[in-house]
Amino acid sequence: MRIYNSATHKKEEFQPIESGKVRMYVCGPTVYDNIHIGNARTFISFDVIRRWLIASGYEVTFAQNLTDVDDKIIKRANEQGRTAAEVATEFSDKFIGVMRAANVLDPDVRPRATKEIGPMIAMIKTLIEQGHAYAADNGDVYFAVRSDPNYGQVSGRNIDDLMVGARIEENEDKNDPLDFALWKAAKPGEPSWPSPWGEGRPGWHTECAAMVHRYLGTPIDIHGGGSDLAFPHHENECAQATCAWHQGFSSTWMHTGMLLVDGEKMSKSLGNFFTLAEVLEQHSAAALRLLMLQTSYRSPLDFSWERLEGAENSLTRIAGTVENLRWAANHATADADEAASEAFAAKAAETRATFKECMDDDFNTAGAMGAVFGFVTECNQYLEQAGDAADKAAALAAADTLVELLDTFGVELPEPKVELPLGLLGVAAGLVAYTGDDVDEAAAKILEARAEARAAKNWDLADAIRDQLKDLGLTIEDTAAGTRIKTL
């Protein structure tokens, strides 16, 4: 397996620190509002990556934090006349709920910043003791960026270049404009905790570094997030961790690309800003995931409602193929062609191999989905050629292949509507004098009568059958593998 490392700008052979085990951390949200689909793109991408690592046999420990104390949370609380804790609790719950609605697996560990103040203070004390941080007279504590000779290793930025044309907040309490806050002195009305430097709260970058170390240990195998976090957040995380504990922070850094809407940056002012909850009210989680899978996680993703509708249609097509394969397997009336069956079975094995090859190449979901779509076409061609002589084992194996590969991605196919109503017994009694109580047998008798009526050009009877079925919410579908009654 090869993974693109954002820090080295190249694909590298993935070698976990501990054989067979992967420790993985992805930065969670600052919980002051509902997450938008750009945020969701990152979380869904890493959910797919995590699922593939698990499918590949790794024992994955996945941690994701909730930043529940931050300037944005405090600002929102003040605007609404609420406490920061109330705002954070509301949007933490909403985040967890919408992630589950999007079929994103819960993390193994979900630490909340406000519950981890002790480890953060301990890390800051260590940094001060080792000369990498200092306390200002006003109660703030800052990381001394120039004390870290490796600063810039995550983002590839040079310290001197950062000073050229950079928008750096002037702060007379800092020794250097590049230094960043590890601890912020308390302000009136803001949440705070006691510390050796007085009442205050942790800086954002401090939170993740301390939580990674506490719950996963360092170094970890994979640290991920959106590309906008590479600098300064991930750079500053890494600087603190490596200076505090004198070991690597993450073997591999992974970052997802930006999400665009109809080719433009998402913005409330442009009217193209959508929350994940809003999207899931109109479309399935599977369709949204399928849309995202068709672009590399590292590349910009262009979202549009038309593309999302197209993804829904693709799901319906795949689900229909799976349904047709299973139906053909259970309703074949002639002997299957052995050579054709073997060739078809080989196509399924080839699809699985191509899928794995793509996913092992930096999680190339676009290539993997290309293999799936190609196999769907081959399945439909096989059914058309086989007619009523489909090979049961090969057809069922093909259906399982499609379902299992998509399940690896967390894509659930829509359930086919196959349960026939008891009212069909009455239709069969009136049309073909059927007196039994087996709905499936009644359906078969009706189809026989329709076939005979069409052969005899008795269009009145054929139309009567169609109309009475329609009244029950049913229709007759003619496929290459045969004819069946299904729900509308």
Stretches found by the model and what they are:
Residues Y58, H132, L474:
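Short phosphate-binding/catalytic loops that engage adenosine nucleotides
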Residues L66-D71, S92-F95, L105-M120, N138-S147:
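Short, glycine/charge-rich beta-strand/loop segments that flank catalytic centers
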Residues T275-L488:
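Structural preference for alpha-helix termini/caps and helix-kink/transition segments
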Residues M1-Y32, D47, G118-A328:
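Alpha-helical recognition segments enriched in aromatics with Gly/Pro capping
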Residues D106, A136-N138, D478-G482:
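Short Gly/Ser/Thr- and Asp/Glu-enriched loop/turn motifs at secondary-structure junctions
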Residues I54, R100, I128-E129, M254, ...:
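Alpha-helix C-terminal capping/helix-coil junction sites
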Residues A77-A84, D108-T114, G198, G226:
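The substrate-binding groove and active-site-proximal loops of carbohydrate-active enzymes
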Residues T8-K11, I17-L105, G482-I485:
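N-terminal, positively charged nucleic-acid-binding surface of large information/translation enzymes
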